[in-house]
Amino acid sequence: LSSSSAASDVYKRQVLGQSYDLDLEQSQNAAIITAESIRRGLPTRAAAIALTTAMQESKLRNIDYGDRDSLGLFQQRPSQGWGTAKQIMDPWYSSGKFYGELVKFSNWKTVSINDAAQQVQRSGYPEAYRKHEPLAKAWASALTGHSPSALTCINRSSETTTVQELARTARRALAPKVATQVTGPTVTFTATDPVLVRAAVALTMASTSLGPIDRATVATTSWRADSEHYASWGAAAGPSASPAASGTGWVSGTVTARS
């Protein structure tokens, strides 16, 4: 999977056999949409359905316009009971409203992703979601931690932010199952489930629109930013980044913000 933004010369990429691209704004919104599914304890399929929907409705952009009074990532309408305009423009709120409606359908886990999206949206173009399914499934798998070492990025921005800000989405999604500790520019995520640690790192990396990162680790794998190329994940140099290697049962991951 990858994301790119030529205008700002800032890129993000994820590879799962092939490239799936999103730009930084899109990947940030994808992280929030996926994080809300994790927070609610929903399976990865729910995130894939929501991402498919937002890709079709808004191209994963939190737009303040649309058909009639439609707004936001999912083009929800205040006049149809989705919430106030201010609420709908909050990606966390709009994602939560989408999932709340999705799970009302008893067959949402068995019908196609396109059809599940259509049940919620009731679009005049009922097959329009289908073309987004491969991209949405790839990102959902990576951001929920089910596709290891999948996310990479290039960020040439000169802007910086705190690692606390970068990790905010992951913390909201995964606390208290994943412990978080900040030391200087580095946030460390620790849990007994490696999938959750991978999700925390991926959600933080997908938030790079807030500021660039320098490096990341998950257990015995590591990644370091390259200003010219999409860096690959590889074996961590030196001692393992994870206490699990010494038999404690705990797994750690880190993300370090560029300072």
Give the ranges of each region predicted by the language model:
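Extracytoplasmic/secreted envelope proteins and their assembly/folding machinery
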Residues: 27-34, 47-50, 73, 92-99, ...
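Catalytic and binding regions of secreted/periplasmic enzymes and modules that target cell-wall glycans
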Residues: 93-162, 183-187, 216-221, 246, ...
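Peptidoglycan-targeting cell-wall enzymes and recognition modules
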Residues: 13-21, 58-113, 117-125
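Single conserved hydrophobic/aromatic residue that forms the stacking wall/gate
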Residues: 1-7, 11
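Solvent-exposed, acidic/flexible segments
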Residues: 22-26, 30, 42-46, 66, ...
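Short, functionally critical alpha-helical segments immediately adjacent to catalytic or ligand/cofactor-binding
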Residues: 34, 44-60, 119-121
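Flexible, glycine-rich surface segments
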Residues: 151-199
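Extracellularly exposed regions in secreted/surface proteins, prominently low-complexity, repeat-rich
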Residues: 139-149, 206-259
